[in-house]
């Protein structure tokens, strides 16, 4: 399975959070799966960590290093991803999450998330 990881899934994996479900852990450990992180997630962490480091315990640099060391591929934001956001129904107002939904949909990826507002976007969203 090819999966785009929601930002919080990567952060929880990095810090060993108990919030990461056993299903998510199992999927992350399955070597048959290929994982991607959006450059929008790195941007989100850079913004939110500088504003609220107590809530976002990792830096963008740490997240990049973790992804590279873990074999998680970078998914850059492309023009078509940005355009696809405009056609999404308004299930969620968070611009970072909307970008991840658009990217997953455009690239034919599953989106692994623990955000309850994302599953209404379609079956490609896997709530873990």
Where are the model-predicted features located?
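General small-molecule cofactor/ligand-binding pocket signal
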Residues: 36, 75, 126
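Short, well-structured N-terminal submotif of metal-dependent ribonuclease cores
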Residues: 1-37, 50-65, 107, 116-120
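Short secondary-structure capping/turn micro-motifs that flank functional sites
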Residues: 44, 65, 83-84, 120-121
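Active-site regions of enzymes building and remodeling cell-envelope glycoconjugates
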Residues: 122-128
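Active-site neighborhoods of divalent-metal-dependent phosphate/nucleic-acid chemistry enzymes
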Residues: 57-61, 68-114
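Residue-level signal for well-ordered alpha-helical positions
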Residues: 16-17, 48, 88, 124
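Alpha-helix capping/helix-boundary segments
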Residues: 9, 41-42, 81, 100, ...
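Generic structural signal for small/hydrophobic residues in well-ordered secondary structure
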Residues: 7-8, 45, 85, 104
């Amino acid at each position: 399975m090819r999966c785009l990881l929601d930002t919080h899934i990567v952060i929880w994996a990095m810090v060993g959070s108990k919030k990461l479900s056993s299903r998510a852990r199992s999927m992350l450990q399955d070597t048959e799966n290929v994982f991607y992180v959006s450059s929008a997630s790195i941007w989100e962490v850079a913004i939110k960590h500088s504003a609220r480091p107590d809530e976002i315990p990792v830096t963008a640099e740490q997240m990049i290093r973790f992804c590279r060391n873990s074999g998680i591929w970078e998914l850059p934001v492309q023009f078509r991803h940005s355009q696809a956001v405009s056609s999404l129904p308004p299930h969620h107002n968070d611009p970072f999450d909307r970008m991840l939904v658009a990217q997953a949909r455009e690239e034919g990826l599953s989106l692994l998330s623990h955000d309850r507002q994302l599953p209404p976007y379609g079956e490609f969203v896997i709530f873990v």
